[in-house]
């Protein structure tokens, strides 16, 4: 039984596990033992409708995963801004990331009354799918509620973009996640602009480089804005506010 199912009161029949597309996962991912630092807090499912006769309310969990590399030497580098965003989200929502499962460091909590799983894969960037695929299956998270957060060299430093779906854009971590979701690409993503390598600089060296002081200010501002964007997405879904957010982000550094 999943933690989500365990959290559903036995007196209610209104909640059911969400539909989950089939994922291709290595057998070893399913049978690997779980090593917990502390006992995780189960998903909490709470109805916002005070009168049960008013109708059933379903709260489908979200899996919010930031992509990056584990280890202190990667902390603060361009390629790890996905990790930083997840850390900010967890801190703002009071979620403690204290569980190791499926090659991930994760925390279980909620945004508003919506259950969320915040995740930092520990399998290294290029193998992020080995962590996210099994977690999505174990917690029965539908594809439309898997939010990936990652760095994007096609966007100026500190510019964010929120999308319902898309390709991998030659991002190795994102590509590996798609492969472990059976080639499916219809999941949300929040990309964080880190700029592009100057001149003939090696792209790998650029990704593993830390931000300049000016760039760091822009990234910190973007992380704050990203937390608000994720909260709005989880509570309200994609809407006109998403389009306005992307438009504001696109021109945030333009001078008129």
Curated annotation (Swiss-Prot):
The keyword Cytoplasm does not apply. It is found in: Plastid, Chloroplast stroma. InterPro entries: CRS2-like (IPR048076), Pept_tRNA_hydro (IPR001328), Pept_tRNA_hydro_CS (IPR018171), Pept_tRNA_hydro_sf (IPR036416). One of its GO terms (molecular function) is peptidyl-tRNA hydrolase activity. The record marks 151 as: Stabilizes the basic form of H active site to accept a proton. PROSITE patterns: PEPT_TRNA_HYDROL_1. PANTHER family: CHLOROPLASTIC GROUP IIB INTRON SPLICING FACILITATOR CRS2-B, CHLOROPLASTIC, PEPTIDYL-TRNA HYDROLASE. Belongs to the PTH family. CRS2 subfamily. Required for the splicing of group IIB introns in chloroplasts. Forms complexes with either CAF1 or CAF2 which, in turn, interact with RNA and confer intron specificity of the splicing particles. Has no peptidyl-tRNA hydrolase activity. Interacts with CAF1 and CAF2. Part of large ribonucleo-protein complexes that include group IIB introns and either CAF1 or CAF2. This is Chloroplastic group IIB intron splicing facilitator CRS2, chloroplastic. The lineage of its organism: Eukaryota, Viridiplantae, Streptophyta, Embryophyta, Tracheophyta.
């Amino acid at each position: 039984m999943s933690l989500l199912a365990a959290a559903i009161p036995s007196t209610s029949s209104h909640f059911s596990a969400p539909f989950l597309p089939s994922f291709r996962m290595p057998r070893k991912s399913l049978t690997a033992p779980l090593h917990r630092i502390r006992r995780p807090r189960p998903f909490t499912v709470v109805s916002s409708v005070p009168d049960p006769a008013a109708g059933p309310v379903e709260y489908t969990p979200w899996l919010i995963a930031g992509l990056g590399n584990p280890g202190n030497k990667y902390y603060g580098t361009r390629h790890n801004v996905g990790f930083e965003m997840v850390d900010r989200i967890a801190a703002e929502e009071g979620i403690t990331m204290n569980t190791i499962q499926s090659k991930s460091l994760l925390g279980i909590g909620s945004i508003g009354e919506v259950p969320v799983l915040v995740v930092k894969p520990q399998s290294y960037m290029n193998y992020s799918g080995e962590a996210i695929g099994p977690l999505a299956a174990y917690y029965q998270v539908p594809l439309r509620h898997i939010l990936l957060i990652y760095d994007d060299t096609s966007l100026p430093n500190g510019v964010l973009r929120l999308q319902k779906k898309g390709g991998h854009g030659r991002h190795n971590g994102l590509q590996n996640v798609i492969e472990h979701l059976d080639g499916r690409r219809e999941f949300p993503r929040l990309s964080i602009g880190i700029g592009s390598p100057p001149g003939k600089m090696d792209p790998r060296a650029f990704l593993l480089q830390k931000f300049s002081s000016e760039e760091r200010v822009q990234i910190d501002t973007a992380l704050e804005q990203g937390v608000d964007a994720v909260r709005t997405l989880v509570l309200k879904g994609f809407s006109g506010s998403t389009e306005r957010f992307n438009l504001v982000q696109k021109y945030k550094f333009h001078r008129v």
